[in-house]
Amino acid sequence: MKKITATIAIILASIFMLHAQGYVPSEDNLRNRKEFSEARFGIFIHWGIYSMLGDGEWAMHNLPMTFEEYSHLAAGFYPSRFDAKEWVRLFKEAGAKYMTITSRHHDGFSMFATKASPYNIVDATPFRRDVLKELSEACAEEGLKLNFYYSHLDWSRNDYYPRGNTGRAAGRPEEGDWNSYLNFMNAQLTELLTNYGPIGCIWFDGVWDKGGSHEEIEKTWKLSEQYRMIHSIQPGVMIGNNHHLGVFEGEDMQMFEQDLPGQNTAGHSANSVVSETLPLETCVTMNGNWGYQVRDKAYKSVADLIRLLVKAASNNANLLLNIGPRPDGTIPEEAAQRLKAMGKWLEKYGETIYGTTGGFMKEQSWGVTTRKDNRLYIHVLNPSETILVPFSGSRLLSAVSFDDGSKVRFTQLPEGIVLTLPERQEGQTDQIITLTFRQLQ
């Protein structure tokens, strides 16, 4: 641990002057941003010893339980049916281009082999396997990008002090060394960026636990130093932080929890300012919980999930769709069925999602748009006979049904394009019309 801490100190000192004038992303980083933006669909995994309680990832806080009580779960955690290759094959079948998994959640338990704490899946459980290592190898084999979620807040450690607003019932003494905690996190991040190959993104969460302004958060968490350290180890790795604010210097993407960019239906994004330059991502639960909740059967329908994916793409954002695996390491069948159905839809309609940007207009009463090259894809999510596409910036060459290539009647007016839609297929979630222009700018 001392050796790791000393190494981190040297890294931070050596790169301080390099970044003194502000963060400049590397060519690899810019390339990763582009690939990330084109991916449009990823899988989020919340998995840890909390899955044994079947009560979601916040079980320790919500029940509540002391850390001493909760930590005994590790001794019984044995996900005998976990198969990294099976997971990755399923995610590929779903049409996902990357996955993001909890390396450590708020309960403080690490799902990887770490020398920074014995409270981890290899040293504290009878399973004694590094699931992140197995997933990194499976992802590399299948060409799926791997990202790591990492919690800034911690309900288990004494050095997470002063305490935040959550985890107050953990039974910790009212004392601790905050700098020790920061060093612990940086030691773990160094391991994650050193032992698991190229990582797409470090996905942070939890700085909101202590509250504060943009400046106060930076001062408390020393984010700029942490970000510089991360980029010094893997210059290409992206950094995102679920702080629900505008982006901080050193961040490479922006995420929105349970909402599309610019919306605040979930109540997390009131103070969020949408970046106009960075890749965007919407993370959404498939049911009502992030971690495994045995009673939660309120899964979104396949149609609703497809609408979410389409609307995210129309907002220049990826959809990061969450699943909470069971304690035995399997993906709930309800989730697997929906993933496979989304994969079949993307096999046919992926051209209108992957590698697209949002169209030139906000959501309309009939639906949304995506764009690629000189084509504008009209996603008619709400059944209509005639629609107005409020865009008149270029000459329209053709309008055809994406399903069969048949021509669609159109009239180009000063206020936009009027489309007379063909008969909608029974049960069709998204009727797509391809508009091809002479050029689009």
PLM feature spans:
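Bacterial Sec-dependent N-terminal signal peptides
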Residues: 1-22
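Mature catalytic domains of secreted/periplasmic carbohydrate-active enzymes
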Residues: 21-441
